[in-house]
Curated annotation (Swiss-Prot):
This is Chromatin structure-remodeling complex protein RSC14. One of its GO terms (cellular component) is chromatin. Pfam families: Rsc14 (PF08586). Its main location: nucleus. It is found in: Nucleus. Keywords: Chromatin regulator, Nucleus, Transcription, Transcription regulation. The keyword Aminoacyl-tRNA synthetase does not apply. It comes from Saccharomyces cerevisiae (strain ATCC 204508 / S288c) (Baker's yeast). Component of the chromatin structure-remodeling complex (RSC), which is involved in transcription regulation and nucleosome positioning. RSC is responsible for the transfer of a histone octamer from a nucleosome core particle to naked DNA. The reaction requires ATP and involves an activated RSC-nucleosome intermediate. Remodeling reaction also involves DNA translocation, DNA twist and conformational change. The gene is LDB7. GO terms for biological process: chromatin remodeling; nucleosome disassembly; transcription elongation by RNA polymerase II. InterPro entries: Rsc14.
Length: 180
């Protein structure tokens, strides 16, 4: 864990994404290390917010015509909004979602599917560093067994051992009269 730069909330989010939070128990020293890292990043963020408050924010550029107003294609092509700051994970507020261009939205969606933090958390706390976190098994590479036949749903009469196959097998069994 000493080599990881993940904060407390990053670790919790990664474990909950993989539904493995019940398998990990942190010691008191590990919790202190995780919270100290998050305190350090919080202090860095507060300092940068104070410096940003002095600088005026640029005006938002309309990138969709349906929002009203005119769209400048040159300005819209150069605009990039930050979508990684959302506190609710993949939730993006409606106003911000409407302002995203299709390229920004695809980057946000790709980041949501990527699960980079979850896999890093799995490597550090569950699988140990250096191991592959989730092995990929390809169905193409696996050999097909000729012996493995398709399983068929069959109802067998207990008295005469008659077999009924198909979608109407229950009704056929009810109408069946055993010949003993």
């Amino acid at each position: 864990m000493s080599g990881s730069n993940m904060g407390y909330y990053d670790v919790l989010a990664g474990l909950s994404a993989l539904e493995k939070s019940s398998q990990v128990v942190f010691s008191a020293t590990e919790l202190q290390q995780l919270t100290q890292q998050s305190h350090a990043t919080d202090k860095g963020i507060e300092g940068s917010e104070n410096s940003k408050a002095k600088v005026s924010k640029p005006k938002r550029v309309a990138v969709h015509g349906y929002l009203g107003g005119k769209v400048s294609l040159a300005d819209a092509a150069q605009v990039e909004y930050e979508v990684g700051h959302s506190l609710l994970g993949s939730y993006v507020p409606r106003q911000q979602l409407e302002a995203l261009s299709s390229v920004d939205f695809s980057h946000h969606f790709h980041r949501t599917l990527e699960c980079k933090a979850a896999l890093e958390t799995h490597d550090v706390f569950l699988a140990g560093a250096g191991q592959l976190s989730l092995p990929f098994q390809s169905h193409i590479e696996s050999p097909r067994n000729s012996e493995a036949k398709r399983k068929r749903k069959v109802i067998i009469c207990k008295r005469c051992q008659s077999r009924f196959i198909g979608s109407h097998r229950r009704s056929q069994l009810r109408e069946h009269a055993c010949v003993d």
